């Protein structure tokens, strides 16, 4: 029976993607099956920040996650992709502060805390909606009814529960320690939010007079101290030398007089000092330097804080002991001349005063890294402040063991070492932030400063037996964003309640994330989860079994994408396309550094002169998967994106060729499978095996390559061509076999490719399913192809491979000799093996049809061949007689001209590259391009010379 069928000439992604997604979502296909007898599979999405929109890094990681989710759903697993967004404390607060500043000329203080937080909730509703819509456009098969937010009621309760429990266990405490302080934003920030910028600075060499008549080994009455931070010297509490530095050993234990402040401070010995740095003597300022802080703790030094939270010089120094409490009895007066000075103004004055006192020895240029707050944009200050901390060492020990014991595996494995290096040197974690947006710390103070920790004020009064007459005020600070993010895998499943979902889907299966947050997020999730979530036997649960670490998506030049560089690409623009004008507006509008706009506009016009064409979601997803080689950074490639859009069109056209073939016969009756039918089924089985093996190793690039290779090179370029002679001249049984093979392989191919390219596969599958007798609603719910152990046909694979080599050799001879495909050729074989002779005997008709041959002959061992062009296939020699096909003299004349042309080009480039002036001045990229052209011309020349010899021999 022949089925009549019509199908559009081209696949139009914009016409089908959103409708298909809506159908999937409304049909509930993204929800877990709820089948408790099936294995569960769960991924918790790294929650995007609600600060704006998704970037290419999100699209990359989410494509990989959705591939795994769709694959496992098709495997029949009870599958959940748990999604949500992160409140992203400091980032979101800054976005909204900038917004009200630009639009209303107001600050958050004009609004007050409660009203400002309401403004942020409004922003979250808008931005979170944008993010979820973008995720839908990417095809993400998320159970949207389970979407969470790190500050929703359930997660807020989980955060309070964790804080209170850790405090009750003595693992959360409040203390005065050194933190990264942003003097512009007035908050402590994490190391992740500190950006170290290369800077041309100075190394000042100051003279610190020795006290009590002491002298150096060479008779000087002072030590020369090298520093990059003169403004903090008022807080010095020691100078340090290396214990083995013979220049200063006699002075260890003596004192110097701190200039300007006129107080004595000790000379101490510590191995931290680099004898080769400066003079080998350094000032120790424990209140204003992280390394000095550690030295100070080792030596019991007081900490003298001389800076305000604005980073101005204080009126009175704050003196703290190593226990973080005020220290009585230590005198450290700040001279009146410096009080109230901004830190860098103080630097200038201090240097000038050293010089006027004759205590400035020298100033040397010095390259250094200055820590900046990545959002405030000003240099951060190590600052002694009262903060809340988690004592994480007990949690870290358990988390380290989980990775050592392979309960959690990192892919690629080398990232385990990064994890271990951080975790084995872990410090207590500062979890408080001086912000308004975030989880308010569940601690209350009475008027005397006593601290009470509980889930809410009512519980505080009950827990601590406080009368309502006792006035309580909640801590103003909020928790570090990473604190709530650290609970993500289990809090989203209902913890602290012991829910069915928590039991069913935890531990989750894999976390896909970037290497830059292994410590800040991944490690903290492992620590928190293993501390709070236990299995039925009381054993700590891991949050996930595998951590797949991706590289960064960079631009085509390998630069990190950033707004300031103007090289950010929006994944939705890859899908829908964007005009040049709109792209320019997107890249240069509302810039923090408007002076860069023209440079960015110029680069954008050069790279995207016609804007960006629409490519559709499937092409974007396939490109991202194909570029996902394990752990490496990825240079984005628009040509690859274009190539994979062409691949999607190739799949559409191949499907159209199959389904609109009016000779397709799927009726019941005798079938006779051809060699080609057997071969393509075996090739498909091998492709399924490759895909499954690759996916199990998170080699998404190899999965994409397997599908591409089979679809384009085997199915389209070969099998479809191999069926044409069958439909033209085959008997009914052969046509039925080819028809069945075509539609069944196509249908299985669509299922194989669906996790990577869901839209086009669903659209084609809806058209194919009737041909194979399927009535199901969606490809999403169909089983993923299995490897069939009996499905490998090694004989068919070997025979077709040999025939392909022969056909390609004949086609190459045609191309090289300018013989039209329509002209029949004779083909002679010499030195043909017995095995290949048998293949030839069985498949002569197929070979004639595919290579457009009139006659095929095997020459006897002593038989003389006519003059012919020869090619080797293995040990066999293929000969195509040329008599009558070409005008020998004319062809040799034409080839002579071509040879001269190529020789001239090779010579021209050789001269250019041997020109020392050119090589010295030209950019490396230009020289590389010339060498590339030289190789191309040389290769072309050699091929034409081979053709010349072949024709000359006729």
UniProtKB/Swiss-Prot annotation:
Motif ('HIGH' region): 48-58
Enzyme type, top EC level: ligase
Cited CDD domains: Anticodon_Ia_Val, ValRS_core
GO CC annotations, alphabetized: cytosol
Main location: cytoplasm
Entry's Gene Ontology BP terms: valyl-tRNA aminoacylation
Binding site residues for ATP: 563
PANTHER family: VALINE--TRNA LIGASE, CHLOROPLASTIC_MITOCHONDRIAL 2 (PTHR11946:SF93), VALYL-TRNA SYNTHETASES (PTHR11946)
Family: Belongs to the class-I aminoacyl-tRNA synthetase family. ValS type 1 subfamily.
Protein name according to UniProt: Valine--tRNA ligase
Gene name for this UniProt entry: valS
């Amino acid at each position: 029976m022949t089925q009549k069928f019509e199908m559009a000439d081209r696949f139009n992604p914009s016409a089908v993607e959103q409708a298909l997604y809506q159908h999937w979502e409304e049909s509930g296909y993204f929800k877990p099956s709820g089948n408790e007898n099936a294995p569960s599979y769960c991924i918790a999405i790294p929650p995007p920040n609600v600060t704006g929109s998704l970037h290419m890094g999100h699209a990359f990681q989410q494509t990989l996650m959705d591939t795994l989710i769709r694959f496992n759903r098709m495997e029949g697993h009870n599958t959940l992709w748990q999604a949500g967004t992160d409140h992203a404390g400091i980032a979101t607060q800054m976005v909204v502060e900038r917004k009200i500043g630009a639009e209303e000329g107001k600050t958050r203080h004009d609004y007050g805390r409660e009203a400002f937080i309401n403004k942020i909730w409004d922003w979250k509703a808008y931005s979170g909606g944008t993010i979820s819509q973008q995720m839908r456009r990417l095809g993400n098969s998320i159970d949207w009814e389970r979407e969470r937010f790190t500050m929703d009621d359930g997660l807020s309760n989980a955060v309070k529960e964790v804080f209170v429990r850790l405090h009750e266990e003595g693992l959360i405490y409040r203390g005065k320690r050194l933190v990264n302080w942003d003097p512009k934003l007035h908050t402590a920030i994490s190391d992740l939010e500190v950006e170290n910028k290369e800077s041309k600075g100075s190394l000042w060499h100051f003279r610190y007079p020795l006290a009590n008549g002491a002298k150096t080994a060479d008779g000087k009455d002072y030590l020369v101290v090298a520093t990059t931070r003169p403004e903090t010297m008022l807080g010095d509490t020691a100078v340090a030398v290396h214990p083995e530095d013979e220049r200063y050993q006699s002075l260890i234990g003596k004192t110097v007089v701190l200039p300007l402040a006129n107080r004595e401070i000790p000379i101490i010995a510590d191995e931290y000092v680099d004898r080769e740095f400066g003079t080998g003597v350094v000032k120790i300022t424990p209140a204003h330097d992280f390394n000095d802080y550690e030295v100070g703790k080792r030596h019991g030094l007081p900490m003298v804080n001389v800076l305000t939270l604005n980073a101005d010089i204080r009126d009175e120094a704050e003196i703290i002991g190593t226990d973080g409490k005020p220290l009585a009895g230590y005198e450290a007066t700040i001279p009146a001349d410096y009080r109230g000075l901004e830190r860098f103004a103080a630097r200038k004055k201090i240097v000038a005063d050293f010089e006027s006192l004759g205590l400035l020895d020298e100033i040397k240029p010095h390259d250094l890294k200055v820590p900046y707050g990545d959002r405030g944009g000003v240099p951060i200050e190590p600052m002694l402040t009262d903060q809340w901390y988690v004592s994480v060492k007990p949690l870290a020990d358990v988390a380290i063991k989980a990775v050592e014991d392979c309960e959690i595996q990192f892919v690629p494995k080398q990232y385990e070492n990064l994890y271990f290096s951080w975790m084995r040197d872990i410090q207590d974690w500062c979890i408080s932030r001086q912000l308004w947006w975030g989880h308010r710390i569940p601690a209350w103070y009475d008027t005397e400063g006593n601290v009470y920790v509980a889930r809410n004020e009512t519980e505080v009064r009950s827990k601590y037996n406080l009368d309502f007459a006792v006035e309580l005020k909640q801590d103003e600070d909020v928790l570090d964003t990473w604190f709530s993010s650290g609970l993500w895998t289990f809090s989203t499943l209902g913890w602290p309640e012991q829910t069915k979902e928590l039991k069913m889907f935890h531990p989750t299966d894999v976390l896909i994330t970037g290497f830059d947050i292994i410590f800040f997020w991944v490690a903290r999730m492992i620590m928190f989860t293993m501390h709070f979530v236990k299995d039925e036997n009381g054993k700590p649960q891991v949050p996930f079994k595998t951590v797949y670490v991706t590289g960064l998506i960079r631009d085509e030049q390998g630069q990190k994408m950033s707004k300031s560089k103007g090289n950010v690409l929006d994944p939705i623009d890859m899908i829908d396309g964007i005009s040049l004008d709109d792209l320019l507006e997107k890249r240069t509008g509302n810039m923090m550094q408007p002076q860069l706009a023209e440079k960015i506009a110029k680069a954008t016009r050069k790279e995207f002169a016609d804007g960006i064409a629409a490519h559709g979601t499937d092409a974007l997803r396939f490109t991202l998967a194909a570029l996902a080689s394990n752990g490496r950074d990825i240079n984005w490639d628009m040509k690859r994106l274009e190539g994979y859009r062409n691949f999607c069109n190739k799949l559409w056209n191949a499907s159209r060729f199959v389904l609109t073939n009016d000779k397709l016969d799927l009726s019941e009756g005798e079938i006779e499978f051809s060699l080609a039918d057997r071969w393509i089924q075996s090739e498909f089985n091998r492709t399924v095996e490759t895909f499954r093996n690759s996916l199990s190793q998170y080699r998404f690039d190899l999965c994409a390559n397997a599908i591409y290779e089979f679809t384009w090179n085997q199915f389209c370029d070969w099998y479809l061509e191999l069926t044409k002679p069958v439909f033209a001249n085959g008997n009914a049984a052969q046509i039925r076999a080819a028809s069945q093979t075509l539609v069944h392989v196509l249908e299985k191919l669509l299922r194989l490719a669906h996790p990577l390219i869901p839209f086009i596969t669903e659209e084609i599958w809806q058209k194919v399913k009737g041909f194979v007798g399927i009535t199901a609603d969606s490809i999403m719910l169909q089983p993923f192809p299995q490897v069939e152990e009996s499905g490998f046909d090694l004989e068919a694979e070997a025979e077709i491979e040999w025939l392909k080599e022969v056909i390609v050799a004949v086609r190459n001879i045609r191309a090289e000799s300018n013989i039209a495909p329509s002209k029949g050729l004779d083909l002679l074989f010499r030195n043909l093996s017995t095995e290949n002779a048998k293949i030839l005997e069985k498949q002569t008709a197929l070979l004639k049809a595919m290579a457009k041959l009139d006659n095929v002959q095997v020459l006897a061992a002593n038989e003389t061949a006519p003059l012919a062009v020869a090619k080797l296939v293995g040990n066999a020699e293929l000969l195509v007689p040329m008599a009558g096909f070409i005008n020998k003299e004319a062809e040799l004349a034409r080839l002579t001209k071509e040879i001269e042309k190529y020789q001239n080009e090779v010579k021209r480039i050789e001269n250019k590259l041997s020109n020392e002036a050119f090589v010295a001045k030209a950019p490396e990229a230009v020289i590389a391009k010339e060498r590339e052209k030289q190789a191309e011309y040389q290769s072309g020349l050699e091929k034409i010379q081979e053709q010349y010899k072949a024709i000359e021999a006729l």
